From Swiss-Prot:
Ranges of Low complexity composition bias in the record: 1-16
Binding site for Mg(2+): 107
One term of GO molecular function: ATP-dependent protein folding chaperone
UniProt source species: Bos taurus (Bovine)
Protein name from the UniProt record: T-complex protein 1 subunit delta
Lineage, top ranks: Eukaryota, Metazoa, Chordata, Craniata, Vertebrata
Length: 542
């Protein structure tokens, strides 16, 4: 008998069939679903463990190098996972989980994966004790519903007019980032940016596309600024005109150059007279285009980038210069919507449609020099009602600028969360410890397996304070025990003060986060864990 064929020990196939549903013979491979489940759980836990060290203000950063050799330095959970090449399908679910949290709340992308990892760890212990996955799944759903109630009880309502609270929320988000030392500059900038694009009285959400982040290499993060208006990184094409007051701005999508034939034709010019006629015709054609533009009163012209041919010929530039029209070319197609919303202009595809009512207006359009590190074009004092702002991010190198942009995006998302759901909750691991405590009490009111599973869910919540303490160099066991004790005495807002390296009332330290971040993290993590639990087989298809 060959070695790789295991000897059959059970009854022959016919006997198994005859036995019908009796005994274990109806379904031989009972271990496979359990093995698949444990394989999925361990793969997903490996992802959670990979980013555990980057949680909190004292968390470490990751350096990620992609296949092309580009390097990213970050401690944003969503960015780390997005760039990791995860192959296991269950582990990929955690990457998607982090992405979902980034879309929903924008912050808490690391926490949500760590909570999911901890819940999966609890599942392993429950499964090993022989509890059925469906019972675990239903109990976790019950625990989640109770958990959201507990978090909502802990939260306090906030008004958008309370600027101090908004600043504290943005600062808490920025404190765990690489750019944390600049949070005193970036927090007010993020709050002002969001407040300028919404009406605080009626807003229920924020469209972050109204806040454009422009990256410009050079300077330091201290040079970042918020501009009410439009900032373009392109250069002014005609160097003579760099400042225009009372600007009338046109945006064209056609080319200011000699027309090309639709088909590939050749024209043979045999003598100088014909050559002269061709040049004269070209000159007259371009001059006519420029005159039509000037006739509308336009004095700043933005030209969309053309990939087919030169969008702006030297001759056209010469005429525009003579007519004192400032020209900015190579405007990207994706920027056009934002430009139109900001300055109230309309894009024009043909010169015949270029009329005065297509123009936008602004108080000032000028090219600004950035202390030797290039130039920017600023268009300010826009008359149009479009509520948009631009944040200019500066930095000494590409890595710093990109991380600063991600950090500002997270801070903007935190303010957006407060606009969506106007309630705040303490940070520093306080809500998680309170959850663990109250869910444990709740589990005592239940009986049977359900009580046991909810108790395991409660214990899993302690991973956040434990990780925060570990990353801050504190003893996780004594810190979590002390926290439990203080919360049992009714101190709901006691959490880990990472800056001072101890335990204190977190609200007094102004460490706060939107309720939506915590609720979203708990909901999404539980849903993902329940999905992974229900999987008992992985089938590969071609």
């Amino acid at each position: 008998m060959p070695e790789n064929v295991a000897p059959r020990t059970g009854p022959p196939a016919g006997a198994a069939g005859a036995a019908g549903g009796r005994g274990k013979s109806a379904y031989q491979d009972r271990d496979k679903p359990a093995q698949i489940r444990f394989s999925n759980i361990s793969a997903a836990k490996a992802v959670a463990d990979a980013i555990r060290t980057s949680l909190g203000p004292k968390g470490m950063d990751k350096m990620i190098q992609d296949g092309k050799g580009d390097v990213t330095i970050t401690n944003d959970g969503a960015t780390i996972l997005k760039q990791m090449q995860v192959l296991h399908p269950a582990a990929r679910m955690l990457v998607e989980l982090s992405k979902a949290q980034d879309i929903e709340a924008g912050d808490g992308t690391t926490s949500v994966v760590i909570i999911a990892g901890s819940l999966l760890d609890s599942c392993t212990k429950l499964l090993q004790k022989g509890i059925h996955p469906t019972i675990i799944s239903e109990s976790f759903q019950k625990a989640l519903e109770k958990g959201i109630e507990i978090l909502t009880d802990m939260s306090r309502p906030e008004e958008l007019s309370d600027r101090e609270t908004l600043l504290n929320s943005a600062a808490t988000s920025l404190n765990s980032k690489v750019v944390s030392q600049y949070s005193s500059l970036l927090s007010p900038m993020s709050v002002d940016a969001v407040m300028k694009v919404i009406d605080p009285a009626t807003a229920t959400s924020v469209d972050l596309r109204d806040i454009k982040i422009v990256k410009k290499l050079g300077g330091t993060i201290d040079d970042c600024e918020l501009v009410e208006g439009l900032v373009l990184t392109q250069k002014v094409a005609n160097s003579g005109i760099t400042r225009v007051e009372k600007a009338k701005i046109g945006l064209i999508q056609f080319c200011l150059s000699a027309p090309k034939t639709d088909m590939d034709n050749q024209i043979v010019v045999s003598d100088y007279v014909q050559m002269d006629r061709v040049l004269r015709e070209e000159r007259a054609y371009i001059l006519n285009l420029v005159k039509q533009i000037k006739k509308t009163g336009c004095n700043v012209l933005l030209i969309q980038k053309s990939i087919l041919r030169d969008a702006l010929s030297d001759l056209a530039l010469h005429f525009l210069n003579k007519m004192k029209i400032m020209v900015v070319k190579d405007i990207e197609r994706e920027d056009i919507e934002f430009i139109c919303k900001t300055i109230g202009t309309k894009p024009v595809a043909h010169v015949d449609q270029f009329t005065a009512d297509m123009l936008g207006s602004a108080e000032l359009a000028e090219e600004v020099s950035l202390n030797g590190s290039g130039k920017l074009i600023k268009i300010t004092g826009c008359a149009s009602p479009g509520k948009t702002v631009t944040i200019v991010v500066r930095g000494s190198n590409k890595l710093v600028i990109e991380e600063a942009e991600r950090s500002i995006h997270d801070a903007l998302c935190v303010i957006r969360c407060l606009v969506k759901k106007r309630a705040l909750i303490a940070g520093g691991g306080a809500p998680e410890i309170e959850l663990a405590l109250r869910l444990t009490e709740y589990s005592r009111t239940l009986s049977g397996m359900e009580s046991y599973c909810i108790r395991a869910f409660a214990d899993a919540m302690e991973v956040i304070p434990s990780t925060l303490a570990e990353n801050a160099g504190l003893n996780p066991i004594s810190t979590v025990t002390e926290l439990r004790n203080r919360h049992a005495q009714g101190e709901k807002t006691t959490g880990i003060n990472v800056r001072k390296g101890g335990i204190s009332n977190i609200l007094e330290e102004q460490v706060v986060q939107p309720l939506l971040v915590s609720v979203s993290a708990l909901t999404l993590a539980t849903e993902t864990v329940r999905s992974i639990l229900k999987i008992d087989d992985v089938v590969n298809t071609r």
